[in-house]
Amino acid sequence: MSRHEGVSCDACLKGNFRGRRYKCLICYDYDLCASCYESGATTTRHTTDHPMQCILTRVDFDLYYGGEAFSVEQPQSFTCPYCGKMGYTETSLQEHVTSEHAETSTEVICPICAALPGGDPNHVTDDFAAHLTLEHRAPRDLDESSGVRHVRRMFHPGRGLGGPRARRTNMHFTSSSTGGLSSSQSSYSPSNREAMDPIAELLSQLSGVRRSTGGQLNSSGPSASQLQQLQMQLQLERQQAQAARQQLETARNATRRNNASNVTTTITQSTAATNTSSTENNQQSIQNSQFLLTRLNDPKMTEAERQSIESERADRSLFVQELLLSTLMQEESSSSDEDERGEIADFGAMGCVDIMPLDVALENLNLKESNKGNEPPPPPL
């Protein structure tokens, strides 16, 4: 209990250091050892103007305040996280905050939660007055008639043992230093260096556990119902989403079918239109070309000249036709004569008599008969 277990100095990075511990009430999870605090260590987020809560180990507290007496209204010395004033008790700190800083909404760390054992050392709140009223009310269950007595009392369950706040194994005590010396008034300190009664501590811990479990059960009730409601809402949303998806799919299928039919009809129409347009364009182009040729070829002339030219063209065409026909007929006749002559030559080569005209044959016969009459008879054999 002579070290701050689990705590390291954010300036020199020394862990589990001894002596006084100074916790910043503005910066989250920022602690300094005594030497760094006195030397004025700062960072980009921490300055020397930030209020600091001094926390002592149990050994240092026994060394400084062993044997002293404390009244009920003087537990410990706390620092105001808004103005940095020190020396307040729980009651006086609550009165000071409600009177001086009621309208302040800056996020600060509770010095009581940071100093008391079992409290949350980094409990940040933006309504410090309400936090003090709810969590750190003045103790009424102590025996006020005893007046001043030796400090051998337990910390109250509402101050950190009970509830959902995390526990710390080491016990810290606060002090306010004036002039280099630390003077402290503690709400929990073993007077005459006596250890805390283990039975009383166990009972207080059990009561805190019961309260925390009861709070958890009470909080779990509405959470379970809320979970059921959320599940029902999720199921309804899923069903609605599925129905919407089915509707969308049916609509998409219908639109796809309609689009397919429309596309086929449009394709046929477009092809027909393109064909007709292409034919029309071709005809127009042909007509335009004819018109252009006629315009270019036809000279400017009178009707008589045109008629004479047309008659000349007709005569020329007839002449050409007759010429072609005559050439074709001559070729056919010449070819037939040549064929006949060839055949006669072939007969002569074969020993056949040449074919001659009728008049020529008659003349030859007459000549032969006359010659026979003039010749002498042949000699007898």
Curated annotation (Swiss-Prot):
Positions of ZZ-type zinc fingers: 4-60
Coiled coil, from the record: 223-261
Annotated region (Disordered), positions in chain: 154-193, 241-286
Function: E3 ubiquitin-protein ligase which accepts ubiquitin from an E2 ubiquitin-conjugating enzyme and then transfers it to targeted substrates, promoting their degradation by the proteasome. Together with UBR4, component of the N-end rule pathway: ubiquitinates proteins bearing specific N-terminal residues that are destabilizing according to the N-end rule, leading to their degradation. Does not ubiquitinate proteins that are acetylated at the N-terminus.
Record-level GO BP terms: negative regulation of HRI-mediated signaling; protein K63-linked ubiquitination; synaptic signaling
Biased composition (Low complexity): 175-191
Gene3D superfamilies: 3.30.60.90
Subunit-structure text: Component of the SIFI complex, composed of kcmf1, ubr4 and calmodulin.
Membership in a protein family: Belongs to the KCMF1 family.
Predominant subcellular localization, coarse grouping: cytoplasm
Protein name, per record: E3 ubiquitin-protein ligase KCMF1
Top-level taxon of origin: Eukaryota
Enzyme class: transferase
Pathway where it operates: Protein modification; protein ubiquitination
Zinc finger boundaries on the chain: C2H2-type: 78-101
GO function terms (MF aspect): transferase activity; zinc ion binding
Positions with a binding annotation for Zn(2+) 1: 9, 12, 33, 36
Keywords: Coiled coil, Cytoplasm, Endosome, Lysosome, Metal-binding, Transferase, Ubl conjugation pathway, Zinc, Zinc-finger
PANTHER family attached to this UniProt entry: E3 UBIQUITIN-PROTEIN LIGASE KCMF1
EC number(s) stated in the UniProt entry for this protein: 2.3.2.27
Record-linked InterPro entries: Di19_Zn-bd, KCMF1/Dystrophin, Znf_C2H2_type, Znf_ZZ, Znf_ZZ_sf
Taxonomic source organism: Xenopus laevis
One GO cellular component term noted in the UniProt record for this chain: late endosome
PROSITE patterns, sorted: ZF_ZZ_1 (PS01357), ZF_ZZ_2 (PS50135), ZINC_FINGER_C2H2_2 (PS50157)
